[in-house]
Amino acid sequence: EWYELRKGMLTASSLACALGDDHFKSRDQLILEKVENKEIPFVPNPITEWGVKYEEIATKFYESLNNVKIIEFGLIPHPNFTIFGASPDGICSNDSPNEYVGRMLEIKCPPKRKFTKTCPPHYLMQVQGQLEVCDLDHCDFFQVKIEDYENFEEYEKDLFLDDDVILPGR
């Protein structure tokens, strides 16, 4: 159903592609998909599967860290331009502290990309589009690095030094 709603609609997550800044799809391919109303189904890859696997954990972590409740909305059409829409990862509910009410959340859980203090440009376009669709002013771009361990011993090796002291930042 989500894919059906997106057909023919430009979404915030497609803005970078529409502006020619996508590593996986050309602007021409996007235009062709939208004009023909035949969006090619997204084929998951290891990076997107990783993000989907850990997005709920990252949301819970954000909620705990900021003492908020996140509500998911699915695909939201722009109130004035129905051919444009967005699917933010969540918005802080009215049950959240005042400074967080209505704050949007966009989560990324990249398995390998190195984090910087700034939002990568292609994600910034997505966030700006989401804010416009939802008529909001603030978004937390929340990047989470989650380690996946094969076994408990591997986890312990990462957590402790040889003398059983917990490493800083763990």
Language-model segments: what does each one mean?
Residues 1-53, 57, 148-150, 163-170:
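Charged, glycine-rich intrinsically disordered N-terminal tails and low-complexity linkers that flank
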Residues 11, 48, 59, 82, ...:
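Residue-identity detector for threonine
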Residues 55-59, 124-127:
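Short, well-ordered alpha-helical scaffold segments within catalytic/effector domains
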Residues 62:
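Active-site region of the double-stranded beta-helix
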Residues 65-88, 92-170:
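Nucleic-acid nuclease catalytic cores
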